[in-house]
Amino acid sequence: VHKKRMTQPMKMTAYEKHDWAEIDLDALRNNFRAVKARAGEMPLCAVVKADSYGHGAVECAKVFAEEGAAWLAVSCLAEARQLRKAGLTLPILILGHVEPSRAPVLIQEDITAACYSLPQARALSEAACAVGGKVKVHLKADTGMGRIGFALRTDFDAALAEMLDACRLPGLDVPGL
C-alpha cells in the first residue's frame, strides 16, 4: 500500500538545518474522519493557520475539504488568499485582526473576518458600505482568557448589547459567533 506523504521544509536557523516535518496525509485524513464520526452532524472547522503549523496549509486544507470540513480557519488575510488561490472554495474564517481597509478583498474573495469589538464592527461595516457590499464576520466573545473579544466575562449585559448592535450594522453579515 502506497502512503501519500507530504514533506514540508521548515524555516530553520543554520544550526537546525537537519530538521523537517513530514505529514502522512492518509493519517491526517483518518484522524479527521475519526473526529467527524464523534462530532456527528456538527459542522467542523479545520484550523490551518501558520501553514498548518508548518505542515503545508494548502495540502492539509485540501484533505479537510475532501473529508467534509465545513470551514477552514487561518490567522491572517494572506493565508486566506493563499487557500483561495489554490482553488479552495470552503468558507474561510480569519482568526486574527483584519484591517477595515481590506473589506473589499474580504467581500470579493468571500472570506469571513473575526470581529472583536463594536468599534471594529463599525469600521468594517463602514468600509463595506463604501464599496456597496457586506463583510461576513464571526463575533468573537471573550469567555474567560481576558485577551480579546466582546467582554462577556466582565460585563455580560453590555457586551451582549454591543454584539446585537454589531449584528444590526448595514455592512455586516454575521453568520457566526
Region locations from a protein language model:
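Active-site-proximal beta-alpha core segment in soluble small-molecule metabolic enzymes
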Residues: 14-15, 19-22, 27-29, 40-176
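Short, Lys/Arg-enriched N-terminal segments with co-localized hydrophobic residues
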Residues: 1-9
